[in-house]
Amino acid sequence: PLKAALLAEKAGAQGITIHLREDRRHIQDDDVRVVQKGINTKLNLEMAPTQEMVDLALEIQPYQVSLVPEKRQEITTERGLDVCSQEKALSKIREKMQDKGVLFSLFIDPDLAQVDASQRIQADSIEINTGKYTELKSPKEIERELERIQKSAKRAAEKGLKVFAG
């Protein structure tokens, strides 16, 4: 993983994102440590909001953590976090990260209630899930989903959140 990260940096990447899954199918804990120490740019650690992952992030102290939901069977992250139903728990994680100087981001579906909840818990940024948009075929459905993404991005920016999409 470090060789790939360094190659990406050499090609102009301004940051490296790695997703440490609970089942460790892509990378291992030590890979995260090696990449964090070996890169020259910023490390964004994508992870599930579990105590095990929080502990590792607090040890490593990446530039940013991005919390994502995780199901063992999925190939890639399929949906956004339900921030509305987890505000208290996510707020505690946010506080721990920000106390260590780690930026805190949430991967959410394009939904205004989720944007508002992300702002209430004082996230630094959100990443809007564009997965559904990429899978739609009907022009009408595509337009509707794009509108949801745009409205969510606008609301987040108005609330002072940095916005990413992916």
Predicted feature residues:
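Histidine/lysine/aspartate-rich catalytic loop segments that bind and position anionic ligands
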Residues: L103-R155, K159
